[in-house]
Every structure is written in structure tokens, then in C-alpha cells.
Amino acid sequence: MGWCQTRRDHGGVIFVDLRDYTGISQIVFKMEISETSHVLADSIRGEFVLAVKGKVAHRIEGNVNPKLPTGEIEILVETLEILNKSETPPYVLENRENVDEKLRLTYRFLDLRDSTLQNNLMLRSQSLQIVRNYFTSQRFFEIETPILTKSTPEGARDYLVPSRVNPGLFYALPQSPQLFKQLLMISGYDRYMQLARCFRDEDLRGNRQPEFTQIDLELSFTEPEEIYKLTEGLMVKLFEETISVKVETPFQRMTYQESMENYGSDAPDIRFDLKLKDISDIASECELRVFKQVVDKGGIVKAICVPGGADFSRKDLDDLTEFAQIYGAKGMAWIKRNQDGWQSPIGKFFTSEQKEALEERVGLNVGDLVLFCADNTKVVHDALGNLRKEIALRRGLINNSEYRFVWVTDFPLFEYSETEKSFTSSHHPFTMPDIDDLEKYGEQDPEKIRSRAYDVVLNGVEIGGGSIRIHREDIQNKVFRLLKLTDEEIESKFGFLMKALSYGAPPHGGIALGFDRIMMFLLKTDSIRDVIAFPKTQKAGCLMTDAPSAVETEQLDELHIRVKASALQPE
């Protein structure tokens, strides 16, 4: 049984490629075998649903199809039943790669008949079982946490659900099970895991969806080392059992500070070098005014040395400058090192000693190129951090068959929000601070307080993040205070947590791994929509069901909700 992919009539013999999720089989209708089936087969069209019975036979020499696992056999049909007819599909299903994605998402039920997507979802199913089996073997409890919960700040906007029986009040769909898994630790369930559905109302990118799945775990009486080991063990098992790739452990580690200094990013791609080099001290002594001014104002000057990059054309350099400007750079200086010395519009501003010091600092050799960026720290790291990845792509420095994991640790507890003009949590407000830093810097320099947070990064993509949590009420209260929460706000938003912490909360910590992002790596796809059965668009819409959609006035009345007229205006 299956679907008709193609039908061919060769001089009275009808061939049909019958497709199901296992693959394609050729079925053959001959008048001398079954006149009734042969006559009925003449009416078969693409995507008709068929049931056949017959004899399996070897294909005759010359008709073998080596591209199919079933290419050496065919089924000589004795009986045929057309289980259902089909409208003509809006596009040729076998040609999906050349079809606009919006059309494919509108007809997702047809798109999912494609063998690539079916294989993707089967591997996803297999991976889910591997995850469950792994944590079961490690003595974890799989416990579901609520989907309808309280709105608490976790970094993104909440999806809100109005309560009909409590007019004017709202549930929120969980951005993560964070607080519930901490409460489970307080309740004595010392090893929790869940394949959790999470919801975040945020601007979407290629690797984000408004609803997603994360591998969520939490442990009592733990330290980061145990969580690292568990995570690494899962990655080893997952990659080996699904795509036969051996993952090297232990993963490399670096602090947040080291990651930003060397790679300009807290999610470094370590498959290639091109590290950032700080030359602020050398630049401040040269005669190039713009360098000196930046350093005098508290900024930095950093450089990237591109081995063999002296062959970049002027157009290449202009293109790279424009690319850096996307990330805030005002411009970019450069040096080419030839046999005769420096080729650069800024070479005249450096003494021989300064040139020698710079060459040694960045590792400049004959045939290389150095690119400079001078600005405040954030701009320099954003510009050069993204530029190193762009150069690696252009120069073919990335081995796409390589999987390089790295732990990034010791994140700042807070980051300053220019829009809110205040400090916000880098991860979430339940992350344990470095106690020495908390006592030392406190309210005077909160940006200097390190956290006990860690991310796991794969090939430049954050695939998970976690931390040791705050288990003491007094420390949690201090962190809330540093976030400028009042007593009333603490009680209304987190009163239940503070109460729980006062009843003997054990030390605990955990991590959440982005399952959909991991699947993107296993399947080598750049789009998260390729690993989810029914994904949303970048505007968080479902083209197939036309969600989100308007609802009846009666439904809104039941919920005591009125939609502003301005919200109903077309864009």
C-alpha cells in the first residue's frame, strides 16, 4: 500500500512507482496477469492511494535500477484497489528543492511526503529515544511540568493565555521549565529530565522557532563537572548511534572572557584559527591619529591575521569593510606583508620597532594580510568576531564534516541594557553568582560579578546553556535587589520560589540543550524548519492552518477581552 509517485504506460504494460515511508517499489500491470487490474490502472494518477497484491519478481536484464534499494525487483500485480483519489498537487513533489518554501509550507502535508523530510523525522524520533534511554540509564526521573503557568521574566516575551474562569487574569506558556525543575529539586527529586516543549515570543532567525523542544535536566548536590560529563556522554551516544560520528571528549573549555578576547563571540567556532589579537598598546604609540583617539577614549584596537591573505584584491577588502560596517565598525585598516615589506596605506604611521612588535603579536608572515578594527570593545568584538567567520567561509577554512564542541564558562551575572538603562540577567535571575565577586563588587560594580553559568557550543552555535542555581533565599534576594526589584515585585512574581527556598533547598544545577538545533547538526541542514514536522514561518505563522487567526467576538466576550481597532488595521 502507498501513493502513486509516477505512472508510465509502455505499450500496454503500465508501470507505477509506489511510495511509502520505507521507499519506492515498482509495480507492474499486465493484461495477461489481471485484465481487471490493468483496466483500473489506466485511471491511476499522481498521489492516488493504492493497495495491490501480486508476486515479487526479478526485473529483466536492462531494467534494473541501481539507484533504488528495491531496484532489482518488481511486483506483478494480480489485484488492485484504489483506496483514494487525489487532486493534482500544486507542484511536482519530487522537485521540492526548486519550489518556493511558502508554497511548500502551505501544503506541508504534501511536503512531508518527501523522503528527505521523512528521513529527518525518523532520525528525530530515533534521537528522542536515545536521549530518553541515556538518562534512564543515568537514574533520572522524567517528569512533566506545567504548560499553563505564571508569567515570569526569562529574557523573551511570554505567550499569554487568558483565563475564562478568572476574568482579567492570564497564564503564560513556559519559556522553559526553569522554576518548576528547581522546585522539584527542593521536593527531593534529585535527578530530573524532560523533553520539554517551550514557547518564546521573540524575533525569529534561521535556527529559532516560537515553540521548540529542549532536553532539560536538573540535579541536586551537583557541580559543573558532573553536568559537563553527563552532557558530553549524551553527545557521544547521540552522534555515534545516529550518524556514526565519534565525538572527542572531554570538550575544550574556555572562560567567557577568553572567548570574547580571542573570538569576539561567546559562541566561538573553533574549527579554524583567525584569533583576534589586541594591539591597543602598540596602536596607541603609533602616529595614526584614529588609533590613538580610540585608545585614549577607553576603546581598543584589535587585529586578525589572515594567512595567505595578501592575495585579497582591493574589491575583496572593500567588501570585507562593508561587511564589518554591518556590525558597527566605522571602517577597517589593513596591511599586506610582501617580500619587500608592508603594503598598506597606514604603514607610514608605524616605526620599524612598532612594525616588528605588531608582526610578532599577530604572527604576520610574508603573504599574509592583517585587518584592524578600532572602536569600543563591543563594536570591535562584534565586527571582528563576525568577520573572522566570513573570511573562513570565503577562504574555505571550515571543515563541514568536523564537529568541535567547547564549553564557555564564567559568564557575567549581569549585562547592561541600553534600552532599559539598567542591568539585566545575562542568563536568568536564578543563576548562582560567584560568591566572592558578589561580596567584592555588589552594587558598586555589578557588571564585574561572574556567574556559575556555562554554555555548550558546537561549531559556533550555542546548543545548550545552564548553571548552578541559587539555593539560598538571602542570595536570591540580593540578586533581585541588584536587578532593582522591589519587595512587592519580588513577592508578586517570585513569592512561591522564595517560600520554597526557605524550606531547605539543596544545592542544585542543570542545563537545557536545544534539541532542534542538535537535530540540525545531525541532519546537516541550515534551516530549523527541516527538522520539525509543522514549523512556523519567520513571522511565527503557520501557512497551512492560517494561524494565528481572528476568533469570534463571542469567544473574546467570554474571556472579557477586546481587541484594539488599531491592531486590526492591515500592515
Please give the residue ranges for each predicted region.
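Class II aminoacyl-tRNA synthetase catalytic cores and aaRS-like
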Residues: M1-E571
